[in-house]
């Protein structure tokens, strides 16, 4: 049960534990609680170059279009600010990935357009006119779980890693 999750408490220099369903016991009267209703998306895309090198692209924030709802509806092209894993193996050129979607093979391409500090502007294009970027992330993306969990993403994480209030796609971690 989700309400049985561990709740860490800090009071007067001491740390103790409880469970989430008892959170109201620890909140002062008149407190305001703000709930995050965004769903964590499958924002990690794993590509393999023809040389065998593996490149991970972690979509952080949409650039074109900038609105999450709009970028998920895009067909054929969108741009994101991304982190790139194993960047030294991706000097130039397009990365390509075959994605199986409703019995069809869609070719997803990624092109590194420019550096943005520690991240990169990546343009994604694909060859299927009715396939949305949300469809591609659902089919080919991996849910980004924190590295401190020391494990790969599991299928059950698609539900259990979300907050109980999550409705709108848009979080990446």
Describe these PLM feature segments.
Residues 1-173:
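A cross-family signal for N-terminal binding/gating loops and helix N-caps
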């Amino acid at each position: 049960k989700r309400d049985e999750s561990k709740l860490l408490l800090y009071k007067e220099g001491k740390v103790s534990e409880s469970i989430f369903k008892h959170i109201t016991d620890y909140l002062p009267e008149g407190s305001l609680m703000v709930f995050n209703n965004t769903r964590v998306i499958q924002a990690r895309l794993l590509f393999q170059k023809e040389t065998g090198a593996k490149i991970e692209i972690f979509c952080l924030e949409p650039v074109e279009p900038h609105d999450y709802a709009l970028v998920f509806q895009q067909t054929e092209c969108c741009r994101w600010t991304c982190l790139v894993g194993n960047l030294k193996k991706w000097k130039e050129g397009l990365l390509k990935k075959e994605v199986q979607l409703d019995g069809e093979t869609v070719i997803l391409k990624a092109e590194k357009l420019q550096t943005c500090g520690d991240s990169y502007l990546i343009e994604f294009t694909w060859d299927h006119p009715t396939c949305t970027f949300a469809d591609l992330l659902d089919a080919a993306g991996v849910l980004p779980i924190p590295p401190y969990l020391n494990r790969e993403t599991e299928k059950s994480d698609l539900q259990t890693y979300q907050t109980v209030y999550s409705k709108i796609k848009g979080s990446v971690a």
